[in-house]
């Protein structure tokens, strides 16, 4: 991994991140933000001119923890796929170390992200202070949903789908993100067992977002509210042939 901004790998308990976790921001520094990027680029298209995009899937366990003496949340973290392993003048606050107010929405960003947001920023179109969203080249999500998962329960002899909200701030969860044939699914749960119904299922055209090779990792940021943003484990694979 390469680390940018305030992100780091905590090999020892240091007050910022749990031992062995990837920390994306410093929980004692307001407005802290950073990125942790896998060191090698990953192929996402057969060629630079191809309109085909390789399918991919990733799973990770994350924890967002506000400090006890400063319970204000801010702002969240994101799984990211980006064109390089630098931070490129990205900003904190609601920009989540993805873009800044000048670059937000620029198609040249070549950015795909799934955000786990714990602060409602009206100027960026956030639906609430506890949501998950899909972002292309922008922190303004193309689709977002209240954080939680679907489960089935038998009611009056019939199986019904019920929704359970999950509070992102102050808890740890496992997330699954998958892309295949132009469709992105995002699922979140409390355990290793993946819920059968995704939280988000959306058609997303990544053919113009992705370059032939991209970098994969995480980003996180804070405002005046301070909290830990940690990744405790992570797996990623795609359909590209070695």
UniProtKB/Swiss-Prot annotation:
Against CDD domains, the record matches this protein to: lectin_legume_LecRK_Arcelin_ConA
Coiled-coil spans are none
- Record-linked InterPro entries: ConA-like_dom_sf, L-lectin, Legume_lectin_dom, Leguminous_Lectin
Q: Does the keyword Phosphoprotein apply?
A: yes
Q: Does the keyword Phosphoprotein apply?
A: yes
Q: A Pfam family for this UniProt protein?
A: Lectin_legB
Q: Name one GO molecular function term.
A: carbohydrate binding
Keyword annotations for this protein, in alphabetical order, are: Lectin, Phosphoprotein
Location of Phosphoserine modifications? 207
For the region Legume-lectin like, give the residue spans. 3-237
Concerning SUPFAM superfamilies, the annotation shows: Concanavalin A-like lectins/glucanases
Family, according to the entry, reads as follows: Belongs to the leguminous lectin family.
Q: What is this protein called?
A: Lectin-like protein At1g53060
Source species of the chain: Arabidopsis thaliana (Mouse-ear cress)
